[in-house]
From Swiss-Prot:
GO terms for cellular component: host cell membrane; membrane. It is a single-pass membrane protein. Residues 28-116 are extracellular. Plays a role in virus cell tropism, and may be required for efficient virus replication in macrophages. Belongs to the asfivirus MGF 110 family. The keyword Transferase does not apply. Keywords: Glycoprotein, Host membrane, Membrane, Transmembrane, Transmembrane helix. This is Protein MGF 110-3L.
Length: 125
């Protein structure tokens, strides 16, 4: 009984936090993941271009309101994401760097990219 309860609780947590459920099916490699999964994909690889709305070189994160506005530069990278059973994978940039993780136990891959982030600071008008 406890196992069933914990299983149901886990599925509910996945829905609340935007994590892809194990039974969500496979996601073939795409540069435009489903809108309802952006919360998951953009948390663990926030430099992906699909996580940002950019206009005139200034970008705002689509998912995380606490992220600062940034200047569009090499920090943003083209990413393709895919899911096969419990394996979630990011394929980033032209060099095709891969980051693979268990979807149920995700690991952020943000640190190496944050070094290139340029925060936008408004000048006083």
């Amino acid at each position: 009984m406890l196992v069933i309860f914990l299983g149901i609780l886990g599925l509910l947590a996945n829905q609340v936090f935007g994590l892809p459920a194990k039974n969500a099916g496979h996601l073939y490699s795409t540069e435009n993941p489903p809108e309802e999964e952006l919360g998951f994909w953009c948390t663990y690889m926030e430099s992906c271009r699909f996580c940002w709305d950019c206009e005139h070189g200034i970008c705002k994160n689509k998912v995380n309101e606490s992220m600062p506005w940034i200047i569009e530069n090499s920090y943003l990278t083209t990413c393709a994401v895919s899911r096969w059973y419990d394996q979630c994978m990011y394929e980033e940039g032209n060099a095709k760097h891969y980051h693979t993780m268990d979807c149920s136990n995700p690991v952020p891959h943000n640190r190496p990219h944050r070094l290139g982030m340029k925060i936008y600071e408004r000048e006083d008008l």
